Regions:
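Extracytoplasmic/periplasmic substrate-recognition and gating elements
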Residues: 89, 283-290, 326-404
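Short, low-complexity disordered leader/linker segments with a strong preference
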Residues: 1-58, 493-547
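Glycine-centered hinge/linker elements that transmit conformational signals in sensory
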Residues: 216-218, 262-296, 340-341, 345
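Extracytoplasmic/periplasmic solute-binding protein
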Residues: 170-183, 188, 212-267
């Protein structure tokens, strides 16, 4: 019996080892699962002084639309900044799409490898903020006497807080804090083939209404017996093309004072006014008067080819519009000569205009090293200096975000030379910039919250799906709209973000229950350790008994 008992441990050792291996494996899985989430960083605290004895290497992610002039502005800004701060080295990574920047940032948050400074949008920042201390709040940095806006220790002529256009700065406030600085601002403009409007017997108003646009567009669909459009003598004519249908829906709702969302994240877009707008889209897609960029391609190409009368696009795309545009995506022999006019986007009530404010902002990512964050903040501020602001704004129909740069002698000289050439001083580009400066008080932005970027995409999807359905000969009625609302709500998971209350900080604290897989993993791990404990206890009791 004694001999048999001595062999027993060998018989049970294997299960014990298996159990131990299983426990370690489960623990490893749990560790890896934890690593997949965002890496927490301590809250940023401003250092008392900037340590100039150290070298810093910071990364800057930017967007340039493949515009070499914009790239040159960035490169010159980095060179000038590094001359002032030789211990700070800036590595720039260029993107051609804001969504790719957004996706890469989200991916890198999980691994703690975000850039230091990033060109972005407030909607995107709201998502970044779901991680703990991922973005550095800028309120205290703004006010810091030494290194803040217009601070005494800056080695450049920085802008003070009251020198930033208030409307543009307010767009960078999310919840109770500022998380970005505005970098450039634009809006949307209506680019018009004025020659064709007058050819159809109409006079182009200073502020066209939606009714005017629809009426002229429907009129332009008339064809001759051979199928050529009467207005241009060609086989192709899309009178009205809108590039960004999310902006189209958002601005229509704002002009109608209709609900879109609350600042707390309550989704309100699925309403009767939206339904009315979609039926309007239905009617004019059916006549061939209206299409979108996603369906038909870039509106500027059709406009320049004499195949479009009204093209809505960003003022930041003005250098692609018109017969003499410095940038073209079509062959020279396709371009038609016409007079181009720049107008505000269509309005329901021109006496009370509303147009969206858009354009990139700059955020600073938090890091374990507060000195590194301060170095990043210094570079971010440098992007608001006059030379950078005017240099970049002049590449397109952008507007500098500081009153200081707007009123500078260099920028005023640039505006005064409108039409002097068809490159740097291209008249359409400067007209577009002046449109925004003259309407800054009429601009607005949508509420920002975690999920607001998805809501924006959903707004455009409603128009896109309605237009596609008409082109596919589907019946677009109330039943269709009801189904569309449900599909879009599900596709963009709006039902999962609707009705949130409180600040983003509150939302992070209220994360809800653990996912089922996490619960199962934790339970399995606990069970494994319990079994190991029971086995060891049993073995100990046996040893005691046989002693």
């Amino acid at each position: 019996m004694r001999e048999r008992w001595r062999e027993a441990p060998d018989e049970v050792t294997l299960p014990c080892k298996k159990l131990l291996c299983l426990s370690l494996l489960l623990a490893l899985c749990l560790l890896l699962t934890g690593c997949h989430g965002s890496q927490d960083t301590s809250e940023f605290v401003i250092p008392a002084s900037f340590d100039t004895t150290r070298d810093y290497e910071i990364t800057f992610w930017a967007k340039n639309d493949t515009n070499k002039t914009q790239t040159a502005v960035y490169e010159q800004a980095i060179q000038d900044f590094e001359t002032l701060y030789p211990n700070i080295h800036v590595n720039m990574r260029l993107y051609t799409d804001y969504s790719r920047i957004y996706n890469d940032v989200v991916t890198n948050i999980a691994t703690g490898t975000t850039p230091n400074v990033c060109i972005t949008y407030p909607d995107h920042i709201a998502t970044y903020l779901t991680g703990n201390h991922v973005i550095a709040p800028l309120d205290d940095l703004f006010a810091n006497a030494r290194y803040g806006l217009g601070g005494s220790e800056l080695k450049f002529d920085g802008s003070a807080l009251d020198e930033i256009v208030p409307q543009f700065l307010q767009e960078c406030r999310i919840g109770a804090h500022y998380y970005a600085l505005p970098y450039m601002r634009s809006t949307e403009a209506l680019y018009v083939n004025k020659t064709m409007v007058e050819q159809l017997g109409y006079t182009l108003p200073d502020s066209p209404t939606w009714d005017f646009i629809w009426e002229v567009s429907d009129e332009a669909t008339a064809k001759d017996e051979e199928g050529n459009y009467l207005v241009n003598g060609q086989k192709t004519m899309i009178p009205f093309i809108y590039k960004s249908t999310d902006n189209m829906m958002i601005q229509m709702l704002r002009q109608k004072d209709a609900p879109y969302s609350t600042s707390a994240g309550e989704i309100q877009i699925f309403n009767d006014v939206t339904r009315e707008m979609l039926f309007t889209v239905r009617d004019h897609v059916a006549t061939g008067a209206f299409s979108t960029f996603k369906i038909s391609s870039y509106p500027g190409n059709f406009l320049n080819a004499g195949q479009c009368i009204f093209a809505v696009d960003s003022t930041a795309g003005a250098s692609w519009m018109g017969t003499k545009a410095p940038h073209m995506d079509i062959a020279a022999d396709q371009v038609r000569d016409f007079e181009l006019a720049v107008r505000p986007i269509p309005q329901f009530d021109p006496a009370h205009p509303a147009m969206i404010s858009q354009g990139p902002s700059v955020c600073v990512f938090n890091k374990p090293d507060a000195q590194e964050v301060l170095a990043s903040w210094l570079f971010t501020q440098f992007l608001l200096t006059d030379s950078v602001q005017t240099g970049y704004a002049e590449t397109e129909g952008y507007v500098p975000v500081t009153l200081k740069a707007q009123q500078s002698e260099a920028y005023q000289d640039y505006l005064s030379r409108k039409g002097e050439d068809n490159d740097e001083h291209y008249s359409v580009k400067i007209d577009a910039a002046e449109l925004l400066m003259n309407n800054t008080a009429n601009t607005f932005v949508t509420p920002v919250f975690n999920g607001s970027a998805s809501l924006r995409d959903a707004a455009g999807q409603l128009i896109e799906e309605t237009a596609k359905a008409v082109r596919r000969k589907k019946t677009v009625d109330d039943a269709f709209i009801d189904s569309l609302y449900s599909q879009v709500n599900s596709l963009y998971r709006l039902d999962q973000i609707g009705g949130q209350t409180g600040s983003i900080e509150d939302a992070k604290a209220n994360l809800g229950p653990l996912p089922g897989t996490a619960v199962a993993l934790l339970c399995a791990l606990i069970a494994a350790w319990v079994l190991m404990g029971l086995y060891l206890l049993r073995r100990k009791l046996k040893e005691k008994k046989h002693k």
